[in-house]
Amino acid sequence: MTQDELKKAVGWAALKYVRPGTIVGVGTGSTASHFIDALATMKGQIEGAVSSSDASTARLKSLGIPVFDLNEVDSLDIYVDGADEINGAMQMIKGGGAALTREKIVAAVAKKFVCIVDASKQVDILGSFPLPVEVIPMARAYVARELVKLGGQPVYRQGVLTDNGNVILDVHNLQIMEPCKLENAINAIAGVVTVGLFANRGADVALVGCADGVKTLTL
């Protein structure tokens, strides 16, 4: 199976976690897009979705799935999204698609986080994939200096503005031995909106696309 076929397999496998009559939290990226396509086959059975990005909102609407503002919703049954890396403790690096802040907010509201990935995203130690940090534009240089103090090598993602109008610093050369501690430290830097470490609130279920099928992992 190609990587895209693995992504499609896990996107469709996540449908089994969708309960009729609920509002579904939907992530962003190529794997999440396959889930959105699958979700469209159930659109008559669900109330609708809450989206983590403008791109996913457009895809949901194009398929006839009602999209709710998160402020209209008290809680979400599930949130389904991909990841750039996931470790054995179900902690993730996310934000390669620059939607990390809205993804983290929707994940916080959801009762269950279902992470959908192909097997290449599984790692023992997070950090090989550059860690995205969303930053208020005027704080970019200051935050970069603070990230260097934490042992990283931040690189400005030029030409990219988030849906919130902010910039992204991608932090290279990290071996993240204590994900929760680093998440808290980066979030404490003035000017940081959020960091793409999903450690304090990790996934509850991971669906991993492998050559021999979809594996289900839980803690």
Curated annotation (Swiss-Prot):
EC number assigned by the record: 5.3.1.6
Catalytic activity, reaction form: aldehydo-D-ribose 5-phosphate = D-ribulose 5-phosphate
Residues that hold substrate according to the record: 28-31, 81-84, 94-97, 121
Swiss-Prot/TrEMBL keywords: Isomerase
Gene name in the database record: rpiA
Pathway: Carbohydrate degradation; pentose phosphate pathway; D-ribose 5-phosphate from D-ribulose 5-phosphate (non-oxidative stage): step 1/1
Protein name: Ribose-5-phosphate isomerase A
Molecular-function GO terms, alphabetical: ribose-5-phosphate isomerase activity
GO cellular component: cytosol
Entry keyword NAD: no
UniProt KW Isomerase keyword: yes
InterPro entries per UniProt: NagB/RpiA_transferase-like, Ribose5P_isomerase_typA_subgr, Ribose5P_isomerase_type_A
Any one Gene Ontology BP term: pentose-phosphate shunt, non-oxidative branch
Superkingdom of source: Bacteria
Binding partners and assembly: Homodimer.
Family statement drawn from the similarity comment of this UniProt entry: Belongs to the ribose 5-phosphate isomerase family.
Role noted for this protein: Catalyzes the reversible conversion of ribose-5-phosphate to ribulose 5-phosphate.
